[in-house]
């Protein structure tokens, strides 16, 4: 037994009951009774009519037991160590004064620059020693004659 739902009121319609309304666009509406059909055809809003299921749902009617509010899970902040740094180190860095942190940063930058300069200097020396004897006259490229085609005449293609 297939039980339908009323398109207006939302109540169950048992087989053999209630009118069916088919619109020109092919949409079919089933109603519980003539009262629902006439209300639908006069374009009444079922949410504003007291006896419909939609109204009762909207205004929270007929809920026998008070449903306790769902507890939402809140994100809790939790501090933990990051790979390569323990929690104590992180907290110590955070509690440092900005001047100290700035001085440390500048010192680290200076050390990195010096290391880079030293590396470049050694690289320069090694490249000069290997490049010096292998100095030969560069070959000149011979220009190839370009093939000149006749101008294109005619339509688009």
From Swiss-Prot:
- Cellular component GO terms, alphabetically? cytosolic large ribosomal subunit
Per UniProt, the keywords (alphabetical) are: Cytoplasm, Ribonucleoprotein, Ribosomal protein
GO terms classed as biological process = cytoplasmic translation
PROSITE patterns documented for this protein: RIBOSOMAL_L24E (PS01073)
Low complexity composition bias: which ranges?
A: 131-145
Where is it mainly found? cytoplasm
Q: Where is this region: Disordered?
A: 96-157
Q: Where is the composition biased (Basic and acidic residues)?
A: 96-117
| Localization annotation | Cytoplasm
Q: Which SUPFAM superfamilies match?
A: Glucocorticoid receptor-like (DNA-binding domain)
Quote the InterPro entries the UniProt record gives. L24e/L24_sf, Ribosomal_eL24, Ribosomal_eL24-rel_N, Ribosomal_eL24_CS, TRASH_dom
User: What PANTHER family does the entry give?
Assistant: 60S RIBOSOMAL PROTEIN L24, RIBOSOMAL PROTEIN L24
- Family to which the UniProt record says this protein belongs: Belongs to the eukaryotic ribosomal protein eL24 family.
Q: How does it assemble?
A: Component of the large ribosomal subunit.
Summarize the protein's role.
Component of the large ribosomal subunit. The ribosome is a large ribonucleoprotein complex responsible for the synthesis of proteins in the cell.
The protein's name is Large ribosomal subunit protein eL24
**Species assigned in the record:** Ictalurus punctatus (Channel catfish)
């Amino acid at each position: 037994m297939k039980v339908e739902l009323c398109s207006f009121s939302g109540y169950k319609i048992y087989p053999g009951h209630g009118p069916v309304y088919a619109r020109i666009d092919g949409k079919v509406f089933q109603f519980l009774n003539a009262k629902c059909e006439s209300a639908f055809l006069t374009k009444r809003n079922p949410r504003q009519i007291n006896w419909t299921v939609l109204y009762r749902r909207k205004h929270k009617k007929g809920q026998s037991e008070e449903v306790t509010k769902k507890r939402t899970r809140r994100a809790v902040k939790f501090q933990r160590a990051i790979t390569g740094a323990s929690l104590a180190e992180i907290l110590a860095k955070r509690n440092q004064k900005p001047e100290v942190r700035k001085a440390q940063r500048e010192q680290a930058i200076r050390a990195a620059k010096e290391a880079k300069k030293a590396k470049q200097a050694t690289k320069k020396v090694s490249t000069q020693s290997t490049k010096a004897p292998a100095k030969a006259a560069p070959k000149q490229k011979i220009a190839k004659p370009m093939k000149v085609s006749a101008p294109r005449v005619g339509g688009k293609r």
